[in-house]
């Protein structure tokens, strides 16, 4: 059984270490999160967004596609293909908040993953970039 132990401060988790037996579960979760992010970004690109956002989303989609392929190889199966793209807000401010929420979740998974698998630290850097972009957009 995979059990999460954390030393908590008043603000947030100071240190989270997952035992090695959690690796498969974490990789499976990250695969699902990356698939969700990829489909949401694809749907977002079809909306009326500012030009700088469209450029970022195009690069972001490439990043997510690469992460997804990497995780599919690691877990030994492909993520489930969606028949249609998810519905996302049409107004950019609401869409930015939705994307920020998904990316913030992905960042938390990436932190856990990088602590367990330092060889995957580049994914953490990508997630920090994505979160940073959407943080700036919603401020």
Walk through the language-model features, giving the residues of each.
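Non-heme di-metal
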Residues: 2-139
